[in-house]
């Protein structure tokens, strides 16, 4: 990844960074909740973004 990024790339990376976090604990506490963890987590070394 170059140090000079276009705004579109930067915005794309920012979105992916926001998506890559665990679910909040209070969501797990909700009644009838079946979500245990965020299945779409991405590790920076294992899975690349295909950029």
UniProtKB/Swiss-Prot annotation:
Membrane-spanning residues: none
Location within or outside the cell: Cytoplasm
GO terms of molecular function: RNA binding; structural constituent of ribosome
Main subcellular localisation: cytoplasm
Annotated Gene Ontology cellular component terms: cytosol; cytosolic large ribosomal subunit; cytosolic ribosome; extracellular space
One BP term from GO: cytoplasmic translation
Xref: InterPro entries: Ribosomal_eL39, Ribosomal_eL39_CS, Ribosomal_eL39_dom_sf
Keywords from the named record: Cytoplasm, Ribonucleoprotein, Ribosomal protein
Role of this protein: RNA-binding component of the large ribosomal subunit. The ribosome is a large ribonucleoprotein complex responsible for the synthesis of proteins in the cell.
Record-stated family: Belongs to the eukaryotic ribosomal protein eL39 family.
Assembly and oligomerization: Component of the large ribosomal subunit. Interacts with IMPACT.
Protein name according to UniProt: Large ribosomal subunit protein eL39
Species in which this protein is naturally found: Homo sapiens (Human)
